[in-house]
Amino acid sequence: MPAQVTNLFLLENLEDASRTRELAESDRKALRAVADWIKTFVVRPHRDLGCAGPVCPFVPPALEHKTLWLAAERSAGRSAPDIVKLIDGYKRLLLAAQPVDGDDASNKSVFVVFTDLPAAQAKDFFDGVLQQIGVRSYVDDGLGWDPSTRATKGPRYTTQTFDRSHHLCRRY
C-alpha cells in the first residue's frame, strides 16, 4: 500500500480520538511513544552526543510550524523493495506538503514508525532497505534520511520502541 496523506498525524492529533480512530490501538500507542520521545529527547540537547543544540536540529522548527508528521506503517510481509517504494511515497508527500518554497519549505519532517517491527530485527531490516534505496536522490531533493537503528536510551526509553522508526526531513 502506498504512502497516504490520511496516514499522517501531527503530534497534537494523537490525543484526538476522532482523528486516530482508524488506527489500531497498538499503532496509536507506538505513535504516542515516538511523539513523547521527540518532545523529550529529539528536540533537546544531549551532552553524550557532543552538540549544544537539539539532537535533530530540523525537528524543533517543524514542530513550531506544525509540519512534523508521524505515520504508522507495518513491515510484515513487505520486502526491502516494498519499503523503498513506501518511503519514496512519503518522500513525495513531504516534498509536496505546504509550504513548498520559501524559508519555511525546509521546516518539514515525517517520522515513519514501523509499529510491528521487533527491535531485534530493525537493524537488519533497515540495512536491507539502505542497500536498495537511492540515497543520492534524497540528497538531491534536499532531504535527510535517518533510519533509527541506533540505541536510544534515556530515563524512560529503550531501543524496544525507537529502533523501528524512520525519519525523513527537508533540509537545504
Identify what each model region corresponds to.
Residues 104-111, 116-168:
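Non-transmembrane, aqueous-exposed alpha-helical and coiled segments at domain scale
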Residues 1-104:
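N-terminal, charge-rich interaction modules
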